[in-house]
Amino acid sequence: MTTSTTGVVVQGTGGVWEVYTEQGERFSASMRGRLKHEAHGALKLAVGDRVTIARDAQHAETWAITDIHPRTSKLARRMPGGRYGERIVVANLDQVLVVFAAARPDPHPRMLDRFLVIAEANGLSARIVINKADLVSPEVSAALFADQMAAGYPVHHTSIHTGEGLEALRDEVEHRSSALSGPSGVGKSSLMNALFPGLDLRTAAVSDAVNKGRHTTVGAMLHPLPHGGFIADTPGLREVGLWGIEAGQVASCFPEFRPLLSACRFADCIHTVEPGCAVREAVEAGDVSPGRYESYVKLRDELMGRS
């Protein structure tokens, strides 16, 4: 009888964590002893963490988490509601798929920039998924997201109704650990169901009154994929707070800014009012999007406490 095994935390509720093992089994486990004590301090178990679990010698059906393996990455954001602190959304990711809708709800490119900066700040590669692509023309969709495409982000146009883009996106997700992130109502759960029908995730319609989706995912859940890899459906976020990044680091989270930073006249240039700023000169020359620059200024001001 196996007494211990390793696996990945795929869900957590009320101190009980569901662990998916390397053998493809699922067990419910809780933290005990040292780990339980440390969980009230700096150590926070998260969905996506790799753990070792052991069977209780007295109760064969009871499992305990005995070790949390070192993380390779994490997707973290500020605690919601104005509280100070970090909330780890998912651990050990390879990439983030930032999902926005072409319409219903209307996309907000500046909000998209915020999601992209969070991925960059966490050292994660990001892909943009423009869902509900059948609701607008390709020309309209391209214009809405032109700034981010020009910044070099891979962009996928998808539709669960026409099947557009699903196969190509599936190829980029299989055998990797990915998280779908984005605002409410953009169709993340429906998209995951279309990519991998066996997941059977709950979905909800978009409210015509507010043009915002109702939350259907109540916490991050990691789903094993049929041919290897995991995909996480994260809750729809109305409030996305930056965490783990200083104001002076925001510029480096814009890929199109990075080649310019060393060309500024002053080493401590903050790219707002200084003479000889290569970033501002690129904006004026049309080489950097004014909209993306606006996002930079707003996010930097937010971290400086000026927003």
Swiss-Prot record:
Coiled coil feature spans: none
Binding annotation for Zn(2+): C264, C269, H271, C277
Domain CP-type G, chain residue ranges per copy: 82-240
Any Pfam family: RsgA_GTPase
Protein's UniProt keywords contain Nucleus: no
Cofactor (UniProt): Zn(2+)
Cofactor annotation remark: Binds 1 zinc ion per subunit.
Enzyme Commission identifier(s): 3.6.1.-
Subunit structure: Monomer. Associates with 30S ribosomal subunit, binds 16S rRNA.
The protein's name: Small ribosomal subunit biogenesis GTPase RsgA
